[in-house]
């Protein structure tokens, strides 16, 4: 977009007009909480990837140098500005590898194993892409760690049961006395005092973790399809 705008300002036709484009930072935005990124910018992402060495100045200093170069006051600044831009481009190439983490959001994985460990259910899944850097994160009822193409998920059990979350929470009512959600089409006949509109964090039902579930990767994948988006969304 920036180069297209510069071509337009100078009355030139842009060679990029017919090329497909990708807003990399927008694509990676869902990863902010999962990977504990302080900001969705290039320095934060490079820091996550372990890229710490740069030979040229940062963006703020580079802008000041560019203005001095453009005004003719400091022609030697061109080398520094070009060097900074080169490092930015090389860094972007490495940041592209972070797209592999989106496999968790796009259901681009397969369930390999599922077992009960104390009061938790442990899932092991295989992503279709290698993850560039090991990561881990957790919430009150969920823990996740990933390395290479393996991700391990630990979900809290309650009396041998799991919560099954639903993303279309506006179509559900939450029943406090039952600690469960039911479709509004069914709750409409209930006393209004017994129900309230469901929210994202209480739109769930419960199901028992059976031996059949523990040995059925398809059922495990179905569960993760419904619930993993919620668990990922609450990470910070």
Which residues fall in each region the model found?
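DEDD superfamily 3′-5′ metal-dependent exonuclease/proofreading module
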Residues: 1-236
């Amino acid at each position: 977009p920036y180069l297209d705008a510069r071509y337009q300002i100078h009355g030139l036709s842009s060679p990029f007009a017919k090329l497909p484009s990708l807003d990399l930072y927008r694509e990676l935005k869902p990863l902010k909480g999962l990977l504990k990124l302080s900001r969705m910018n290039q320095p934060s992402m490079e820091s996550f990837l372990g890229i710490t060495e740069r030979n040229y100045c940062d963006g703020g200093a580079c802008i000041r140098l560019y203005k001095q170069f453009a005004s003719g006051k400091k022609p030697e600044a061109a080398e520094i500005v070009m060097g900074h831009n080169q490092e930015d481009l090389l860094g972007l190439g490495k940041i592209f590898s972070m797209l592999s983490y989106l496999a968790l959001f796009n259901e681009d994985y397969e369930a390999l194993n599922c077992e009960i460990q104390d009061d938790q259910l442990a899932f092991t899944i295989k992503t279709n892409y290698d993850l560039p850097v090991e990561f881990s994160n957790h919430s009150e009822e969920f823990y996740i760690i990933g390395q290479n193409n393996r991700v391990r998920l630990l979900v809290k059990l309650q009396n041998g049961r799991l919560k099954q979350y639903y993303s279309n929470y506006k179509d559900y009512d939450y029943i406090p006395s039952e600690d469960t959600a039911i479709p509004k089409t069914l709750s409409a006949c209930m006393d209004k005092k017994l129900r309230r509109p469901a929210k994202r964090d209480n739109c769930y039902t419960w199901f028992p973790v059976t031996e059949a579930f523990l040995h059925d990767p398809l059922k495990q994948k179905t569960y993760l399809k419904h619930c993993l988006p919620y668990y990922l969304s609450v990470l910070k």
